[in-house]
Amino acid sequence: MADNYRSRIVTQGTQRSPNRAMLRAVGFGDEDFSKPIIGIANGFSTITPCNMGINDLAMRAEAATRLAGGMPQLFGTITISDGISMGTEGMKYSLVSREVIADSIETVCNGQSLDGVLAIGGCDKNMPGAMIAMARMNIPAIFVYGGTIKPGRYKDCDLTVVSSFEAVGQYSAGKISEEDLIGIERNACPGAGSCGGMFTANTMSSIFEAMGMSLPYSSTMAAEDAEKADSTEESAKVLVEAVRKQILPSQILTRKAFENAISVIMAVGGSTNAVLHLLAISRTIGVELSIDDFETIRQRVPVICDLKPSGRYVTVDLHKAGGIPQVMKILLVNGLLHGDALTISGQTIAEILADIPDQPPSGQDVIRPFSNPVYKEGHLAILKGNLATEGAVAKISGVKTPVITGPARVFESEETCLEAILAGKIQAGDVVVVRYEGPVGGPGMREMLAPTSAIIGAGLGDSVGLITDGRFSGGTYGMVVGHVAPEAAVGGTIALVEEGDQITIDARQRLLSLNVSEEELTRRRNHWQPRPPRYKTGILGKFAKLVSSSSLGALTDLNLF
């Protein structure tokens, strides 16, 4: 039986002669019409270093697909550079781009009846966008990560792009010179690849490897190293075989796979954005997963990797120390991973990890032994309270002050907040509130990397809290709480906070509280009026109209009918 399970509707029979005529124009011959047609979703772009090396990988995937017996068809999908748009109106399009990427891949693959898809991406939303599409379509699929950037270097210190964000705060606080500010800027991003710490892109690529949708070791390879291209070729071969065997995302993206992913997130100290994206992917594939599952798993999985933003090392260091397979093997032997979960190769997680040592290699401290973790519990805490009845996400790694109670400093946008920080108007003990930045209110749920980096750069990271209904970059750390739900735009309690109100952030008790009486909150709620939408047309208008709560993954196709 031929392996073109879906594409035969386009390639077979007398009625499809015109269809075949067009396929002949793009390189098909008589012998090719019975082969599986494999889509290669190419996220190449010179907009960002994260994606500028991807075209070469797409060419390698195309050639390898042919050699494996498939017929490749390349098509483009978009990217937004989170780092370049950060702190601007453009950042409102970042989370929106996740949905656009998913829609575009689904549209091409289903519109052309493709038999499988290999997606290649680099910047943050490329990964969840591709995975949402794969979950929607449920056709054999594999993800190829474009690779991580190598660290920059300045004055004997390793740099990432976050170093440059923090340098802005340091310079504004008089802690570094303009020469150092520009020196860091010039050296932070030395070439191709996604931001180098365990930020969002590297977190999501690690998740896909842990879930079995990418090949072992592929998530931590440097973009510019030869092994990345070799891994891409192998990914294409594996995908063609998966089409033949009909290994589907629904067989891989199970409840066990999501639990494995959360365990790995905690172990590597991954980004808060993983919570949002995994909730979205799980709902798309039909797996029951809630924000509370992250808290349950957090309490039993230690952080065993010392990685930036709060740690010392970058992702290429993790790769040299054994990568995600080494992390997963440590979790597996300690009963924190489901070894029977299936992967796109047809092997189980346990089979893939069989030859990996139980202990991390000696002579390095990027990956710690299970008995000597960086932190005894996971770092992504789910906070609840009257300020976040649906929940909020806090990254508590590296936090020296786990409990803060202080006066609210209220800002209606990221820009006004950043201006106040750089002007020295935020003091130790303050709790900064940035609202109307949620999925609906932004719209688009911008990341607050500029304000949080400015707080760190000013030396206030241990003494100032920040809460928002927006998101945080994977490069953020400190006493910060994001994804506050319900958001301000739909009448969440965060909309009722007034300047000077006392707010408590308690990481130990997982509590986020506005210390105002219920009677006063009721009075304020009765006077609250929703704000008119900032955008009434275009993609931001559509997003604001359709998007769900961040506690449900901020999807645009949830409960449409």
UniProtKB/Swiss-Prot annotation:
Q: Origin, by domain of life?
A: Bacteria
Report the co-factor binding details: Binds 1 [2Fe-2S] cluster per subunit. This cluster acts as a Lewis acid cofactor.
As its record notes, the protein acts as a catalyst of: (2R)-2,3-dihydroxy-3-methylbutanoate = 3-methyl-2-oxobutanoate + H2O; (2R,3R)-2,3-dihydroxy-3-methylpentanoate = (S)-3-methyl-2-oxopentanoate + H2O
Positions contributing to [2Fe-2S] cluster binding: 50, 123, 195
Keyword Protease attached:
no
Cofactor or coenzyme needed: [2Fe-2S] cluster; Mg(2+)
Positions with a binding annotation for Mg(2+): 82, 124-125, 447
Question: Pathway, according to UniProt?
Answer: Amino-acid biosynthesis; L-isoleucine biosynthesis; L-isoleucine from 2-oxobutanoate: step 3/4; Amino-acid biosynthesis; L-valine biosynthesis; L-valine from pyruvate: step 3/4
Q: What is this protein called?
A: Dihydroxy-acid dehydratase
Q: Give the organism the record lists.
A: Microcystis aeruginosa (strain NIES-843 / IAM M-2473)
Protein's gene = ilvD
